[in-house]
Amino acid sequence: VFQRTANFSVPAVNRPLTKQQEEAYKREYRLHREEALRTPFGIGGHPPPQKYAHEDTEEARSESFEKKWHTGGNISFLYAYKDLLTNQQANETACAFVRDKIRQTVKNPEVAQWLMPDDHPIGTKRLCLDTGYYETFNRDNVTLVNIRKDPISEMTATGIRTARNTYELDAVIFATGYDAMTGAMLDIDIRIAGGESLQDKWAAGPRTYLGLVTAGFPNLLIITGPGSPSVKANMIAAIEQHVDWIRDLMAYVQAGGYQQVDADTEAEEKWVAHVNQVADSTLYPLANSWYLGANIPGKPRVFMPYVAGLDKYRAICDDVAANAYRGLTLAKSAS
């Protein structure tokens, strides 16, 4: 395993469902979907936490984290306390718990140390789920290569060469990431009649209204774009909400005889400021994550998702629609 940057991982605790559990879930499926849409992450089944971390003793916190560890799931773990993603001291109690788990699990102390993240609060990068990940490093046929200490110099015909060693490999699985949230759109040469491109508009970072439209680019409607919950929610729920909202907008446009939909510049400015304000009230900006574009050299460092929660975002979008699509400019002739 060639590791550049350690990330936190918690157990998935996947398990087979009994026939009774499966039947009950299918019977109540619609209720589960409706519940999910009322939650911040778009994922139901996780009661929101009622306590702040400092309200528990160290022993009680350890018991709480232990219970979440054995329950499994990243949402469940981050729901141990109300302030894990907003208070650095609270977050550090969760970090310390997971680091202790790594020490207890991985027999080689040096390898264990390499696997312990020390550069970001837990949950501010996508929290990984695993089945026996840390236990894997106790196997005789598994080696961890710390490429910060021994960087990769080249790929060879038979494997990978680092500054110090050569590794013969049958297969290489890349986990190097991608240009999230804006990369696919900016790969398309989207231009308006005056010649300005979307690349020009977003040169200092993406700017949208609700993550759905960007001022000056009429009739360009974006699905789960920057400025919306997008990757910080259940993507199915996020996509469906956007598609439904755009469908209703199109019906409104057609009924009114409009030809063009655009974002009001002032509404966009206020939304961008709101997205940044919400992000700054959390610990997310403290991580060099792909949420900020940190994995792409030269990409502007802008926190792209809206992290107030899918539930709050849906309410905002519904309110915009109920008020004649406030913040949008509708025209009966294309400019």
Model-derived features with residue positions:
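N-terminal FAD-binding dinucleotide-binding subdomain shared by FAD-dependent oxidases/monooxygenases
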Residues: V1-S335
